[in-house]
Amino acid sequence: MITYEKKYLMDTYNRYPIMLVKGEGTRVWDSEGNAYLDFVAGIAVNSLGHCHPALVEAIKKQAETLIHCSNLYWNEKQIELARMISENSFGGKVFFANSGAEANEGAIKLARKYASLKYGGKRYKIITAKNSFHGRTFGALTATGQEKYHKGFGPLLAGFKYVPLNDIEALYEAVDDEVCAIMLEVIQGEGGIHEATPEYVKAVRKICDENDLLFILDEVQTGIGRTGKLFGYEHYGVVPDIMTLAKGLGGGFPIGAIVAKEDKAVFKPGDHASTFGGNPLACAAGIAVLNEVTKDGFLEGVDKKGKYFREGLETLQKKHKVVKEIRGKGLMVGCEVDLEDASEIVLKALEKGLLINSVSHNVLRFVPPLIVTEEEIDEALQILDDVLSEIRF
């Protein structure tokens, strides 16, 4: 089947040479029957692992009842999921989309709509961080502070500024009377698992309050328990005005969401819409995921396992000089290696039955299912140890 790729599929992905056909828990199997421990999890998507019984049952039951209906009509699953998100976050109103990029596009539109209503169109610029990633549709692409993703797609959307992450002075300097919002990831995922400092996040909130700007938090990768808290902002003692979600919310089923404080949720009928966003099947999946993730002890378990994993990586760091730095929160972990390119490590790990990926060339990213066990973490660490021992640096 892989031989048909170039004939039928656009050449948009650097794929690894395996065909995945089955998944269960933290493992997947290829077409040759080989099993892999999955520490990619669909890039932080399979929050409950593969084919979790509660998720499968929710999707199956809903598929037998009502798969899709237009947003011209109410559906109870959409209302229920919105309620769960609102009551477990900061009490905002929710708009459903189908992906993180869509959610971020909507957040950008919402910020500009809010500023237009309040300031008559004088404020429209949005500040984002260098090295950030917010998606590949035009607004989200322009918000992304990485030139490599911009090449060949100009002219981009006007009205974006980029400042270095954690540089509070640069942030103050970037604010002028045309800025309407600051958009941030508390941990840059595609950018290399770089964390915003508590001081920086609090400074963003302070600057937004002082200048009547909207604080947009991209929680597409950090949200739904990935960092050991239900939402990443909970680590910092601040609350955003707008938050975007996707990835882990559906546990593998496509869904995205914008959450906005009630006074910032200024969209009116016709301002924004989605054909598929908030369909009953996607929302049933989201409800099943949130039911599991919000169970007593679940998030504490994610935090505990994340610390256990980082401690294991720090032990490897002492043994292997190529390991430069360990960073991240919960089960969103980065391991920077002293190489120009970490792809050989990724490929060797795959050969030994461990799926990982690299970002920013030399950072190994680990985002396993949140249900991973300490025994499976030990297994992954052993494979990494073997790989690092075999490769000549």
UniProtKB/Swiss-Prot annotation:
Q: Which sequence positions carry the modification called N6-(pyridoxal phosphate)lysine?
A: K247
Sites where the protein binds N(2)-acetyl-L-ornithine: R136, S274
One Pfam entry name? Aminotran_3
Q: In which pathway does it act?
A: Amino-acid biosynthesis; L-arginine biosynthesis; N(2)-acetyl-L-ornithine from L-glutamate: step 4/4
Q: List the GO biological process terms.
A: L-arginine biosynthetic process
Query: How is the co-factor bound, per the entry?
Result: Binds 1 pyridoxal phosphate per subunit.
What superkingdom does the record give? Bacteria
Positions bound to pyridoxal 5'-phosphate: G100, A101, F133, D218, E219, V220, Q221, T275
What InterPro entries does the record tag this protein with? AcOrn/SuccOrn_fam, Aminotrans_3, Aminotrans_3_PPA_site, Class-III_PLP-dep_AT, PyrdxlP-dep_Trfase, PyrdxlP-dep_Trfase_major, PyrdxlP-dep_Trfase_small
Broad enzyme group: transferase
User: Chief localization class?
Assistant: cytoplasm
Localization of this protein: Cytoplasm
What are the protein's GO molecular function terms?
identical protein binding; N2-acetyl-L-ornithine:2-oxoglutarate 5-aminotransferase activity; pyridoxal phosphate binding
Catalysis: reaction(s): N(2)-acetyl-L-ornithine + 2-oxoglutarate = N-acetyl-L-glutamate 5-semialdehyde + L-glutamate
Q: Which PANTHER family match?
A: ACETYLORNITHINE AMINOTRANSFERASE, MITOCHONDRIAL, AMINOTRANSFERASE CLASS III
Q: Supply the HAMAP family for this chain.
A: ArgD_aminotrans_3 (MF_01107)
Homology family: Belongs to the class-III pyridoxal-phosphate-dependent aminotransferase family. ArgD subfamily.
Q: How does it assemble?
A: Homodimer.
Q: Report further notes.
A: May also have succinyldiaminopimelate aminotransferase activity, thus carrying out the corresponding step in lysine biosynthesis.
Its name, as the record gives it, is Acetylornithine aminotransferase
Annotated source species: Caldanaerobacter subterraneus subsp. tengcongensis (strain DSM 15242 / JCM 11007 / NBRC 100824 / MB4)
Biological classification of the source: Bacteria, Bacillati, Bacillota, Clostridia, Thermoanaerobacterales
